[in-house]
Every structure is written in C-alpha cells, then in structure tokens.
C-alpha cells in the first residue's frame, strides 16, 4: 500500500563542518508540503550520530510522522547511525537511503580507525540490514530498512520522490536546511545572534 498524499515522513540529513556536523530533520508530506524542521549536531568523526537523530525525533514530538528516512548510515565522517536503535527509540520504521553504489564501509573504517573506535563502528555496521538497490523512476537508490520490509520501504521512498528527482523530498529538504544551518551556526558562529 502506497503512502497517501497527507502521509508524513521525517527526513534526516547532515552537513559536515570540521568539528561538528549539522543535522536537520525535515517533516515532509507525500504531497511535498514541508511541515516542520528541527536541528541537532553531532561530532564529526565521533560516535554520537544515533543520539543526535534521537534528539531530532524527540524535539519534533510529531506522532503523525509515519516513517523516518535518513541520508546514508555514516554522516559526519563515519559517525555511524544505529538504525535499530533509532527505530526502537521512535517506534517508527527507518529507511536509510544512499545514492551511489558502494563496496561497503568495512575497508574504509579499517583504514581510518583502530582499537575500540574501530570495534564500536564495526559492531554497528555489521548489525545494519543489507543494502538493496531500488528503482525510483529512472534512478537507482540503495536502501536499508528496519521495521518495514524492503518492498514496502521501496514504496515509501518512491512515494516521497518527485518524478525526475531521484531523491526523496524529505531528504532533499533536510539536506538543504542542514547546509544552511551549518553555514549559519557552525562555519560562522560569530554571525549568530544570541
């Protein structure tokens, strides 16, 4: 069953700065109406992305949101999101969406980290559901779904993706707002009024 026009999804995307990454959560309806925005930050190269995503959800306090879409699983330079933990926290299905084919993150993780930092990231990464390619119009995206089967997740992604876009609208809006937030609050904090 495809989402109805008034159905809502929370899209989460990040924009990275040197030390912090700006996350934005955008609530968007399937008919492309933007309903709400919320912001949080996480550490670039840290291990707090899952907690930041949970903060976004808590700040929204939007029981009408039916799905969470997240742009990838490793925002903020390998700050992995535990999709199961986010789904459990929000009591909502979570679908991670990426836009490029990949051989996976295990090799890059091993190149960048060692010891406990590597072990922690590998533990999260290995628990992620498999990545599946999905056709959305003329484009191919890659999804990992928690709390929803792959076919239903593909329907959700397609329903929130405008024709010819290749990117679900909640993620497009969240990415734009995260970038604007990063420029305002992280890149030039001296220009931010108290």
Model-derived regions, located:
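Long, charge-dense
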Residues: 46, 82-141
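Two-metal-ion RNase H-like nuclease active-site motif
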Residues: 1-18
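Conserved active-site and cofactor/substrate-binding residues in soluble primary-metabolism enzymes
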Residues: 4, 20, 48-52, 63, ...
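Amphipathic protein-protein interaction modules
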Residues: 68, 135-149
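Gly/Ser/Thr-rich loops at beta-strand to alpha-helix junctions
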Residues: 15-18, 72-80, 100-103, 148-150
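Charge-patterned, long linear interaction tracts outside catalytic cores
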Residues: 145-194
């Amino acid at each position: 069953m495809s989402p109805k026009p008034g159905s809502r999804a929370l899209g989460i995307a990040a924009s990275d700065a040197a030390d912090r990454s700006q996350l934005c959560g955008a609530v968007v309806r399937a008919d492309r109406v933007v309903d709400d925005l919320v912001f949080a930050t996480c550490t670039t190269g840290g291990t707090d992305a899952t907690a930041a995503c949970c903060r976004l959800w808590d700040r929204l306090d939007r029981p009408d949101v039916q799905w969470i879409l997240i742009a990838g699983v490793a925002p903020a330079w390998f700050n992995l999101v535990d999709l199961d933990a986010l789904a459990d926290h929000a009591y909502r299905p979570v679908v991670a969406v990426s836009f490029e084919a990949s051989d996976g993150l295990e090799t890059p993780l091993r190149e960048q980290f060692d010891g406990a930092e590597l072990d922690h990231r590998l533990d999260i990464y290995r628990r992620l559901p498999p990545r599946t390619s999905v056709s959305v119009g003329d484009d191919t995206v890659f999804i990992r779904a928690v709390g929803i089967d792959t076919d239903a997740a593909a329907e959700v992604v397609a329903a929130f993706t405008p024709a010819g876009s290749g990117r679900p609208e909640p993620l497009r809006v969240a990415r734009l707002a995260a970038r604007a937030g990063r420029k305002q609050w992280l890149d030039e904090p001296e220009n931010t009024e108290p």
